[in-house]
Every structure is written in structure tokens, then in C-alpha cells.
Amino acid sequence: MITVYSKPNCPQCTATYRKLKALGLPFNSIDVTEDADALAFIRALGYQQAPVVVVREGAQIKEHWSGFRPDLLKKYELKE
């Protein structure tokens, strides 16, 4: 599962959402300006800017990054 931690008026967040939709990838989005626990989580990962993308397999975090990274998103493209 892919989760995007974002904030309002964030061009890189919007670009990330668009790319995820174009690739057909399901994702959750969490607004860190409205969720203090989510903000604390991404800060604990070492990030200070949005978006932060976290990819999980089950309960395990597989990968995470900050910013618009279409190269990394493409790795998770659904194959038919």
C-alpha cells in the first residue's frame, strides 16, 4: 500500500497524485496539517517537506522518500 503524506497547496504533492493515478496505483493520502501523529511520523523518518511517500508491504515499510519522484513511483506500476 502506498501512502502520500501531503499538505495543501503543494505542487509536488499534486504531481505525485497525478502520477499515481496515471500509473493506476491505489494510494491513501494524509494531510499532515490536520494529523499531528502523521506529521510526527514523517519527521521521525527524517523528512521536513511534503510530499512524503511511504510504501508498505503488510505492516512493514518497504521504501520511503520525499518529493515528486516519478522514477520511484514507476517501480510500483501495476502490470496486466
Question: Residue locations for each model-derived region?
Answer:
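Non-catalytic, surface beta->alpha helical segment in thiol-disulfide oxidoreductase systems
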Residues: 56-80
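Short polar/charged helix/loop
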Residues: 22, 37-41
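ATP/adenylate-binding site constellation spanning eukaryotic-like Ser/Thr protein kinases
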Residues: 7, 47, 70
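Local sequence-structure signature of Cys/Sec-based thiol-disulfide redox active-site neighborhoods
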Residues: 1-25
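Conserved beta-strand positions in the Rossmann-like core of class I SAM-dependent methyltransferases
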Residues: 28
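Structural micro-motif
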Residues: 45-54
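Non-globular targeting/processing and membrane-anchoring segments
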Residues: 9-11, 15-18, 43, 72-80
